[in-house]
Amino acid sequence: MSESVANRAVVFYNNKSLPIISSEELNLDSCYSSSEVVIRVHAAALNPVDFLLQSFAYSWLVGRGPKTFSRDYSGEVVRAGANVKDFKVGDKVSGLFQHLYGKQGTLCDYLILDPVKQPAISKLAAAGHAEYDDYVVNAAWPLVFGTAYQGLTNFGQKLGPDSKILVIGASTSVSNAFVQIAKNHLKVGTVVGICSKKSFDYNKKLGYDYLAAYDDGSVVDSVKDIIGKNLNNEKFDLIFDSVGNSDFFGCINDVLKDKGQNSQFVSLTGDKKMNYSSPRIWDSLPGLESLKRYGPFRKYNYNLFMLRSDSAFMKLGYEMISEKQYMPAIDSVYSFDDYAKAFERVKSNRSKGKVVIKIH
């Protein structure tokens, strides 16, 4: 006799509709192929990109069907196809499910995926967190950890003890992962962070060697002072911007090594900080400064990138959590029924770490 269950999901239809909980019957014995697994989702994390995409979901562009939220997940495999090699029923897993306006997201009861096509999946790491269980912790890290890892490794740089990195937006969840990977895995010699003055103590504990405040005088002058007084006038090999900033472009040659040394400016969002509660599409468009980044006008190596699904960062994240070398920052945890409160917390821009929704 086949087993049918209710599969709830938080969905929206377009940028004018409010998110709602929908439910449909799912036959656990016939809903998957021989190459797929069915995961009972225990926890899912929210990311600002969820609300950015919702804001741009015009009906004429994305259609009228239901769209879903979230990409990070943790849970338990309850069905596995005959051709699935690395996962079996009973395995506890976490991962990143990539989709764009998909009918399936991770803010649901059950997730069906092919581990070959969605390779960012691993066994659940034993976190040993003092406050949160392993499902909550493991839902909080895949997207931000993967983004940080690829920002450090995707552009041909050999970073290590002699390297110097500047992180713009030191307190974000991505930068939280970034500094822990840089210091604990790559053994980068010097990481300088930019954050609010009140966040200095917290970020120092994560591993930043020096910090500059964006809310206490000129942040550009503060960074230049650090270069002169603490770095022996050596410029940065990598500037990593996780928030959207243009402060340093006017003096890029004073802070970033020559492009011939494969120095890189890596950005996640472009030149402007995005307001995720009411984003504007033109805020993400390149400005005149972009002419200095490409073709014959290129003055420095610049990369605006998005995370690609990959098993490599999941393997490393699992190892680092298990070895107590990385712990994601968690701001708050909400129940599935309180998803609206969780959404507002993310859109407030006041969360200090990941917002996680506990489903089971």
From Swiss-Prot:
GO cellular component: lipid droplet; mitochondrion
Alphabetized UniProt keyword annotations: Lipid droplet, Mitochondrion
InterPro entries: ADH-like_N, GroES-like_sf, NAD(P)-bd_dom_sf, PKS_ER, YIM1/Zinc_Alcohol_DH_Fams
Location within or outside the cell: Lipid droplet; Mitochondrion
Record CDD domains: AST1_like
Record gene name: YIM1-1
Protein name stated in the entry: Protein YIM1-1
A Pfam family per the record: ADH_N
Domain of life according to the entry: Eukaryota
